Regions:
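Extracytoplasmic ligand-binding site segments that recognize negatively charged/polar headgroups
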Residues: 117, 291, 334
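Long, low-complexity segments enriched in small/aliphatic residues
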Residues: 310-311, 315-352
């Protein structure tokens, strides 16, 4: 599960990053990151891979700090916790250096690549990017075996769980000289934040949780259920939208029909890669097609094309599907090995066959993800987790929770669940959001609320009415 970034407020940096950093931040060095104009501060903190024995292999945790612009009235820092699991937190530096500068008015922003991600011993191997790769199964057997063999040369794959990583994060906090911190987690990053809140409660000032993934979620058990709910809502919007309904008057039937066709026989499509003369034949299986559609509901920008894609595919035309599925310019930003090390310890082993059958039978997305990840975890070493890992996290810290009503992986009910144990929390549902704010108008609404929450240290008096004005883009009804 991955969360996408929100468009953030602009604020002139005024060259403040060139100031001398106080306290523990002086341990960092000025640095330049690709695509970012201003000077940031970077460093490495070395931790033991095995935190219990404190011997053997070490990991250099990659740290990027974007300093607050107002050092005189500077408040507690914001620690960014990335999603995935497997996404680099340092990759978010571009947001906070550009459209997200408003977050840094009074707060340092600290991005730490969690062990196994980014430049902190990233657990991933290269893959050949043929056109078929983009529509192949998630975890082919040979790929998982090859990845495990390669990564075990430089990592104990059982030592990359969330609980271990959050102790790393607290080491970084102490090393940089911070006392209490604000946590900002999206998707899997919300689980990381919750675990940090349980393990290091005295150092949490506040938390912002966007698209909540509770510790007991058992990913990907509920992906099909959540995806089907989001799809019903999305297709319902199309049916009520005059242009979309006029273009695709039987869109719900189209959705059922294309899945039935692919269940009977995978589609074989001639595809001409850009810049190459010879076409290639691509096979599209039902499970892969469904998973692509579900993943495109994460952001409303891509979701706007789903009715078009479904309608044409139901009529045997997969051109628009492949146009969106095959995107060589998009990097592999999730470290697959880290994803497996987390979920094969914290989630998949606790999925029973009875649960999986009950939740996926008759579901349009079926058991694809459960099957793929269960099979992969059968070939992956399993890490240990604390006995109370799946229990609810209780905290008196102020917490602001955002959920998207059309989220296909972490629907609002998960935000409601965690809020029960957070008495100083507030749960805000964004009516038209998916698994993040991508594609919505007035995305600055969420940023304004988040910054105001951090400044006040309370969510009680926030005027959240602006979330009702965050509108999705119009449905795409024709090829572009």
């Amino acid at each position: 599960m991955i969360t996408t970034g929100v468009v953030l407020l602009l604020l002139d940096a005024g060259g403040c990053a060139k100031q001398r950093l106080p306290g523990g931040l002086s341990k960092l060095k000025p640095c330049r990151l690709a695509g970012i104009d201003e000077e940031l501060f970077c460093g490495k903190l070395t931790v033991f891979e095995n935190r219990e024995t404190r011997t053997g292999r070490t990991i250099d945790l990659n740290i990027v700090v974007l300093p607050a612009f107002d050092q005189k009235t500077k408040a507690e820092p914001l620690f960014d916790l990335a999603g995935g699991p497997g996404v680099s937190s340092a990759g978010a530096a571009g947001f906070y250096a550009g459209p997200g500068k408003a977050y840094r008015r009074r707060h340092d922003v600290v991005c730490v690549d969690q062990r196994g991600t980014g430049q902190s011993n990233r657990l991933a191997i290269p893959r050949e990017k043929t056109p078929q790769y983009y529509v192949s199964e998630m975890y082919p057997i040979d790929y998982v075996k090859q990845m495990r063999h390669a990564l075990e040369q430089r990592a104990d794959l059982t030592k990359y769980t969330t609980s271990i990583a959050m102790d790393d994060l607290d080491d970084v906090r102490a090393w940089l000289g911070y006392d209490r911190i604000n946590l900002f987690g999206g998707s899997y990053g919300t689980r990381a934040a919750l675990v940090y809140m349980r393990q290091h409660p005295d150092h949490v000032r506040s938390a912002i949780l966007l698209a909540v993934a509770p510790t007991d979620l058992k990913m990907p058990l509920h992906h099909s259920e959540s995806g089907a709910r989001a799809m019903d809502l999305l297709l319902g919007e199309c049916e009520r939208d005059p242009p979309c309904h006029a273009a695709f008057p039987q869109i719900s039937d189209d959705w059922k029909n294309v899945l039935e066709q692919l269940e009977k026989q995978p589609a074989r499509v001639e595809y001409s890669p850009p810049g190459k003369a010879a076409p290639t034949t691509i096979e599209i299986q039902r499970g892969v097609f469904g998973e692509k559609i579900r993943s495109w509901m994460y952001g409303r920008d891509k979701a706007a094309r789903i009715p078009l894609i479904i309608h044409h595919a139901a009529n045997g035309d997969f051109a628009s599907f492949l146009q969106q599925a095959i995107a060589p310019s998009i990097p592999d930003f999730v470290a697959d090995g880290m994803y497996l090390s987390v979920t094969c310890a914290e989630d998949v082993p606790f999925i029973t066959p009875e649960e999986a059958t009950k939740l996926t039978a008759g579901n349009p997305f079926g058991n694809y993800r459960v099957f793929q990840q269960t099979r992969a975890c059968g070939m992956w070493p399993r890490g240990e987790i604390p006995t109370d890992f799946h229990g609810p996290v209780s905290s008196n810290a102020p917490v602001l929770i955002f959920s998207g009503n059309l989220d296909p992986v972490t629907p609002p009910k998960y935000g409601e669940e965690v809020a029960k144990y957070l008495p100083n929390s507030r749960h805000v549902i964004v009516p038209e959001a998916g698994h993040g704010m991508d594609g919505l108008s007035d995305q600055e609404c969420v940023d304004r609320l988040t910054i105001e929450f951090m400044d006040k240290g309370s969510a009680k008096d926030l005027d959240v009415s602006c979330v009702g004005r965050m509108a999705p883009p119009p449905f795409v009804t024709k090829y572009k």
